[in-house]
């Protein structure tokens, strides 16, 4: 079930990886470009305003890191003009985008997504509405494009325990105070894992 915080004027939502899969599939039924847009936000942590722009020319494999990185020009959380960062792309998303570019006959500099920011946001709302209707799950109606980045940050910082400096770099945050509002409480699975590990370490002393 989608986790929500409706204690503030703007409801915040956090999707699990499985729920993100559902959203991608729902969006993909209305067009491959929609699915790609959601992958870039939910799997790579892009803001809705950053989705249109990146292309094959921006994607590179880092031999040092053994990972895919791609250049994103986006918000500067310190203020001022936009800045470029290297965002991380999971292998599965890179594979999908290579296939997408081939089948769409995209040139290296052709953006994967050409839709406006408002259109990208609408795609998320439409896919979430489809799931809410099909599953009789009203919480999905509150899901927005920003919640995909929120879910991405929580999944890696809270659930996977990725270090903050790494997340600041690939997510485009200038300091931890800019990330903290994105985070949700750990899931029960994460709490259980943490407490079991702590208990095991205590017993071994």
Language model features: what each stretch is:
Residues 40-54, 159-162:
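A short, glycine-centered helix-capping/turn motif at helix boundaries
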Residues 2, 13-47, 200-201:
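Basic, Lys/Arg- and aromatic-enriched nucleic-acid-binding interface segment
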Residues 90-140:
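Active-site/catalytic core of tyrosine-dependent DNA strand-transfer enzymes
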Residues 53-96:
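Conserved tyrosine-mediated DNA breakage-rejoining catalytic core shared by Y-recombinases
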Residues 29-30, 125-169, 176, 188:
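Short, basic (Lys/Arg/His-rich) helix/loop patches that form interaction surfaces
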Residues 171-196:
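Catalytic-site neighborhood detector that most strongly recognizes the C-terminal catalytic loop/helix
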Residues 1-22, 79-91, 106-107:
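DNA breakage-rejoining catalytic core of tyrosine-based enzymes
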Residues 25, 53-54, 61, 181-184:
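Phosphate-coordinating loops and pocket residues in cytosolic domains that bind phosphorylated ligands
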């Amino acid at each position: 079930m989608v986790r929500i915080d409706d204690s503030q004027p703007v409801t915040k939502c956090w999707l699990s990886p499985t729920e993100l899969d559902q959203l991608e599939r729902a969006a993909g039924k209305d067009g491959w470009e929609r699915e790609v847009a959601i992958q870039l936000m939910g799997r790579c942590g892009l803001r809705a305003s950053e989705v249109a722009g990146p292309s094959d020319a921006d994607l590179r494999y880092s031999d040092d890191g053994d990972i895919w990185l791609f250049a994103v020009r986006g918000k500067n959380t310190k203020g001022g003009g936009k800045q470029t960062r290297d965002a991380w792309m999971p292998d599965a998303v890179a594979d999908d985008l290579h296939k997408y570019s081939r089948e769409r006959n995209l040139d290296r500099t052709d953006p994967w997504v050409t839709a406006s920011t408002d259109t990208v946001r609408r795609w998320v709302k439409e896919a979430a509405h489809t799931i809410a209707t099909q599953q009789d799950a009203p919480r999905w109606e509150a899901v927005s494009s920003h919640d995909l980045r929120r879910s991405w940050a929580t999944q890696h910082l809270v659930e996977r325990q990725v270090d903050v400096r790494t997340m600041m770099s690939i997510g485009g945050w200038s300091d931890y105070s800019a990330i903290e509002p994105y985070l949700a409480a750990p899931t029960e699975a994460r709490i259980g894992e943490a407490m079991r590990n702590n208990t095991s370490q205590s017993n071994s002393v």
